[in-house]
């Protein structure tokens, strides 16, 4: 009896962890291919992540505006915000990766440009997410749908703030480190 209970618990635990570990990839196959092509170029990689992240916000606006998508709209917005947040995390990971890596003079220059573009993009993203939150709080229909995505919206706003702060901090470090340009 005890062995059967232990086996049942073990199976339940294995099934639960396998489902918990499955997250859908926010990138399409084509987007993943584009990223692979520029894997060693910090600037192009950051530009692509910004483009893909912006596309999630554009899709979110389309879902909100399309009356045909009214059914399940809150869940669709939730999923797009989740994808957006995952992509913002990828931007953070790339910032960390390239900040800690010795870069050639040209790559460091490109990284600086990428940092500036991340800051500008984060300001845009922040404004768009703030607008979504305002609509979700003030529009009666959207308020009902917002129950499905308000928590994820807050996560997205936190992620944007984190990315913007990180890019600003790294930009200051890169500007103050002239020796980094002389290393290669």
Please provide the spans of the model-predicted regions.
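Sec-dependent signal peptide recognition
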Residues: 2-10
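Hydrophobic h-region of N-terminal signal peptides that target proteins for export
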Residues: 11-20
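Long, charged/polar, soluble alpha-helical segments
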Residues: 21-184
């Amino acid at each position: 009896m005890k062995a059967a209970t232990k086996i049942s618990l073990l199976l339940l635990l294995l099934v639960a962890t396998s489902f918990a570990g499955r997250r859908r990839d926010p990138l399409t196959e084509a987007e993943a291919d584009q990223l692979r092509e520029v894997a060693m170029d910090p600037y192009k990689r950051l530009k692509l992540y910004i483009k893909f992240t912006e596309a999630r916000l554009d899709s979110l606006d389309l879902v909100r505006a399309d009356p045909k998508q009214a059914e399940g709209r809150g869940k669709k917005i939730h999923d797009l915000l989740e994808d957006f947040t995952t992509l913002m995390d990828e931007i953070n990971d790339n910032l960390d990766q390239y900040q800690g890596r010795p870069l050639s003079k040209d790559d460091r220059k490109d990284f600086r440009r990428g940092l500036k573009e991340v800051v500008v993009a984060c300001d845009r993203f922040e404004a768009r997410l703030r607008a979504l939150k305002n609509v979700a709080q003030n529009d009666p229909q959207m308020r009902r749908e917002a129950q499905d995505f308000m928590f994820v919206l807050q996560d997205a706003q936190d992620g944007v703030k984190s990315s913007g702060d990180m890019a600003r901090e790294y930009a200051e470090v890169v500007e103050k480190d002239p020796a980094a340009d002389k290393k290669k």
